[in-house]
Amino acid sequence: MKSMASEHSSIKERKCAGYVWRGMTLDESFYLRAVAIVMIMAHNYLHWMPGSPGENEFGFNADRVALMLEGLWQNPWDAPRLLASYFGHYGVQVFFFLSAYGLTKKYSAASPAWWSFQTKRWKAFYPAIILSALGYLIYEGFRVGWGEVWHDDVLNLLRQMVGVSNFIPANVYRPIGPWWFIGAILQFYLVLPFLWRVLQKYGDKVLYALLVGGWILQCVLGHIIYAQFDLNINHSILGHLGVCSMGIWFARRNEVTIPWWLLLLSVVMFIGGNFFYELWIPSRVVLLLFLLPLLRGVCGYLGKRRWCGAVLLLLGQLSVYLFLCNGYLRRPIVEWAKQESHWWTSTWTCIVFIMIVTAWALMMRTFERRIFLVLGRRPR
């Protein structure tokens, strides 16, 4: 009895000291993926609408937040479009965190060989990439013509698929804008086994060095490679070292108490990061300090509701296909919506767009599973 009372008292003290982060279940990670992918899809669609303020995703400009605030003041009903177009891209940071967190939980203790780890990741990732690429060629072939797609897109698409388009300025977003992420995540896979080995020897000091080093690279190297080569550091894993280090750090702990003062400070710093370049540099990391606890709370609540939990789980399980396919399925609906000036047009067409992408992703996953069954492989 005394032991139980002592344990209860200890838990209460930790909650008073701050937010208590505990390891995520698989369902929780799917819920977070679901929210993140909806943020990304809404952003990828709505930032094409006329009057969108832009976003501080790959570069900083304080005028963008000013435009968003001005739009909210002039037309509060347009808030979904303005907020999603400006903030929605942060869903990508949730994915970087979850990738670092999940892979570290799964593999770091075993210290897999470099080549073995790469082949496992390729086998897990490339079926979806290949099917989504074929889906793009078929979709665009019917939409604009096979000759045009073959002449303009095939080479650029192949470079995006293997992750080298990030080093070719004209190819980064062509033909599928969000596929810059493929190159960045493949780079992360390349260095992760080495990082785990170094961590075993030197511990968390490595993560702290990566966190600070990533910010220094952003400030110094980012300007140099942009000026000299027209390349953006945020199209590579170098621009996301802080978030990935954070994911690994949390994965190495079963429980973390984040002090309330640190959560409050992270909110203040993130707000400041929309106005000042110096605070924008660490804004992705400080955002996740309070966003992830918030999302876990919301998802935990919704997950207990039968239909909400089922929808979140489905979207989370489809998140790879949703990410890979949403970029090209924007057309032609986004072109039509851009011609309409009413705020509600962007909102309802965005909902329709997300539903279309979800149906397409379900179809892609069904094809993948059928192919795996024919080949005698276990479906994902």
For the regions a protein language model found, what residue spans apply to each?
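Membrane-cytosol interface segments of multi-pass membrane proteins
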Residues: 1-214, 318, 339-380
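Hydrophobic alpha-helical segments, especially transmembrane helices
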Residues: 34, 44-45, 94, 122, ...
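Aromatic-anchored segments of alpha-helical transmembrane domains
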Residues: 38-45, 161-167, 211-224, 265-278, ...
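Loop-centered beta-sheet repeat module
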Residues: 192-199, 204-249
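Alpha-helical transmembrane segments and terminal signal-anchor/GPI-anchor hydrophobic tails
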Residues: 227-353
